[in-house]
């Protein structure tokens, strides 16, 4: 019994020290993540050896060359899905990751390859982006700078040099793609379901009106058709419709690498955002996007000449029908194609658009099989569906342009995109019957409250989970006070402010917190610890200083090295005599944070 009590006491002591993670226990990034390279005639293969207790982000693995644009779209080994409330679903790797970079064009001269990658320790500390350089000869072999043997071709090689220069800081939308909006084989089922539901939503817009008489003629063409035969004919018609969309999806997938390169340029991104706005306005009925009447009439005449009731004829009708309604559904289709283009995968692109077309075809199959009486009656709700797509397109436009717009303008735009539809629902809902009125009031109320809260928090420099999801973070203004203390991005300004505070009150220490946008534990600390009332009661937030090292500049790296950190988060108590506490690493709850502060103040 005494032994059991002793063991339990030791366990409690260990738990009490859990928040005091020792920085010496962490590996430097060059040991936590070791890239190894193999060069072939058709590209470069990279293998990362990852230490136990660490993981890497797929989306942060980027390859660039000098001269530029030698590499095509990379392909990755299968990773693990990690759901994060701040960054969404992420693909991560433990133990090992493999990446293949194909050559985008013939390579005949030596070039430099720079790999940028990033990972975290399971203990809660994230490393800044690391750059590793390789000098590669143009004949498909690795050019050694050390004592590497000449027979380096077709085997994994150690890097020639590593540095943490931060020359390639993690952009908000880097080449790895935003994993919250990523179509991949790992998330295939969820993505296909989303495309199917989007197609189902499109089917309830006025775009589908021209197809209704065509579907009716399919069944009429076979006078002896029962419901089973009508069902088969309707399905064949939808397959023809789907074929056209599938081909478009394949093209989008094949041109994905080119699309990715273009979307790295600011003017292209802003032009795409403007196009989304124009397409959204068409969904609001300000103008119509459609084929010229003469072209529409030609296609309709061609389809009417085909005899209904025959499988081949019905299939061709479906193909022609896609050309009739294509311009009408162009706005949401443009967004879908941009989404698919990130994959560079023709099969995935074709599957996605095929599923979208199937969703669009469900009501058409129902009409062909059972007749139009089984579908809801046309009315204002169909316009509501179009308006919903319009607001979604406007939100996409803002999301694309976010890196190139001022923070407070983006907050204002997102707020309007919630408040305007809320007001429309509440005003128009008054004219509806009981059930539609209840739905309109419920949705309108949620959007109104959510939009007001989102705007208020954003205007005051505070963040919510939605701000994090949209990658919206208040700009770090030197010395600006917030619920997280005084924020700095410039290290010189930070040191000057800390020195002033310590000279004014030498008997009171200050707290220094290292933060970065790409650090999950930093987000958790901001959302669940540093904003708690009990923390503000225990800690003078006027003496709480936060340095934002998101940009990972040489000055940021020097400060991290000065404090013995590989990356954020890390919190220190700094005293006027120059001494400082051991760092608080990783995420801890408010009570543990206060306990640590009281022990080190």
Swiss-Prot record:
Residues 213-242, 288-310, 368-380, 428-438 are cytoplasmic. The chain crosses the membrane at residues 192-212, 243-263, 267-287, 311-331, 347-367, 381-401, 407-427, 439-459. Residues 21-191, 264-266, 332-346, 402-406, 460-601 are periplasmic. It catalyses: [protein]-dithiol + NAD(+) = [protein]-disulfide + NADH + H(+); [protein]-dithiol + NADP(+) = [protein]-disulfide + NADPH + H(+). GO terms for molecular function: electron transfer activity; protein-disulfide reductase [NAD(P)H] activity. Residues 1-20 form the signal peptide. Disulfide bonds join 120-126, 207-328, 519-522. Residues 137-176 are annotated as: Disordered. One of its GO terms (cellular component) is plasma membrane. GO terms for biological process: cell redox homeostasis; cytochrome complex assembly. Required to facilitate the formation of correct disulfide bonds in some periplasmic proteins and for the assembly of the periplasmic c-type cytochromes. Acts by transferring electrons from cytoplasmic thioredoxin to the periplasm. This transfer involves a cascade of disulfide bond formation and reduction steps. This is Thiol:disulfide interchange protein DsbD.
């Amino acid at each position: 019994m005494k032994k059991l009590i002793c063991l339990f006491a030791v366990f409690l002591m260990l738990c009490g020290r859990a928040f005091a993670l020792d920085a010496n226990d962490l590996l430097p990034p060059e040991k936590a993540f070791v890239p190894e390279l193999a060069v072939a005639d058709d590209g470069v293969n990279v293998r990362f050896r990852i230490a136990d207790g660490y993981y890497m982000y797929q989306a942060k693995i980027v390859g660039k060359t000098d001269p530029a644009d030698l590499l095509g779209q990379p392909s990755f080994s299968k990773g693990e899905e990690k759901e994060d409330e701040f960054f969404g679903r992420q693909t991560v790797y433990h133990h090992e990751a493999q990446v293949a970079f194909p050559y985008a064009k013939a390579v005949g001269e030596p070039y430099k390859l720079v790999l940028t990658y990033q990972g975290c320790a399971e203990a809660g500390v994230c490393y800044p982006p690391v750059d590793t350089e390789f000098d590669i000869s143009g004949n498909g072999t690795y050019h050694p700078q050390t004592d590497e043997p000449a027979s380096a071709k077709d085997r994994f090689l150690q890097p020639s040099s590593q540095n943490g220069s931060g020359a390639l800081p993690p952009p908000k939308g880097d080449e790895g793609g935003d994993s919250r909006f990523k179509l991949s084989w790992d998330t295939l089922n969820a993505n296909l379901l989303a495309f199917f539901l989007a197609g189902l939503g499109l089917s309830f817009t006025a775009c589908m009106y021209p197809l209704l008489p065509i579907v009716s003629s399919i069944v009429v063409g076979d006078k002896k058709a029962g419901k089973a035969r009508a069902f088969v004919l309707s399905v064949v018609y939808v397959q023809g419709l789907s074929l056209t969309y599938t081909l478009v999806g394949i093209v989008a997938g094949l041109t994905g690498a080119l699309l990715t390169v273009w979307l790295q340029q600011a003017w292209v991104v802003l032009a795409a955002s403007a196009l989304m706005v124009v397409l959204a306005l068409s969904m609001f009925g300000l103008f119509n996007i459609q084929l010229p009447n003469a072209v529409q009439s030609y296609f309709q005449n061609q389809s009417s000449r085909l005899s209904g009731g025959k499988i081949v004829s019905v299939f061709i009708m479906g193909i022609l029908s896609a050309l009739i309604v294509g311009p009408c559904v162009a706005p949401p289709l443009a967004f879908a194609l941009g989404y698919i283009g990130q994959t560079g995968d023709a099969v995935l692109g074709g599957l996605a658009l095929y599923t979208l077309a199937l969703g669009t075809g469900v009501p058409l199959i129902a009409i062909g099989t059972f007749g139009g009486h089984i579908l809801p009656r046309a009315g204002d709700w169909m316009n509501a569906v179009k308006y919903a797509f319009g607001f979604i397109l406007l939100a996409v436009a803002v999301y694309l342009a976010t890196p190139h717009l001022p923070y407070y303008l983006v907050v204002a735009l997102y707020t309007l995109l919630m408040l305007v539809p809320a007001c429309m629902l509440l005003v128009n809902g008054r004219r509806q019957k009981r059930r539609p009125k209840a739905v309109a009031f419920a949705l309108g109320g949620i959007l109104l409250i959510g939009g007001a809260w989102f705007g208020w928090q954003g205007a005051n420099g505070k963040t919510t989970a939605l701000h994090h999801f949209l990658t919206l973070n208040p700009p770090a203004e030197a010395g600006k006070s917030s619920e997280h203390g005084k924020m700095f991005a410039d290290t010189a300004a930070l040191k000057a402010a800390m020195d002033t505070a310590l000279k004014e009150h030498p008997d009171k220490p200050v707290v220094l917190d290292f933060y970065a946008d790409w650090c999950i534990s930093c987000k958790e600390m901001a959302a669940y610890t540093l904003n708690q009332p009990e923390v503000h009661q225990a800690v003078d937030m006027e003496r709480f200083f936060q340095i934002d090292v998101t940009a990972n500049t040489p000055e940021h790296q020097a400060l991290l090295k000065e404090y013995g950190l590989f990356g954020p988060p890390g919190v220190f108590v700094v005293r006027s005599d120059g001494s400082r506490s051991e760092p608080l690493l990783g995420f801890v709850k408010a009570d543990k944070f206060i306990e640590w502060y009281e022990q080190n103040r």
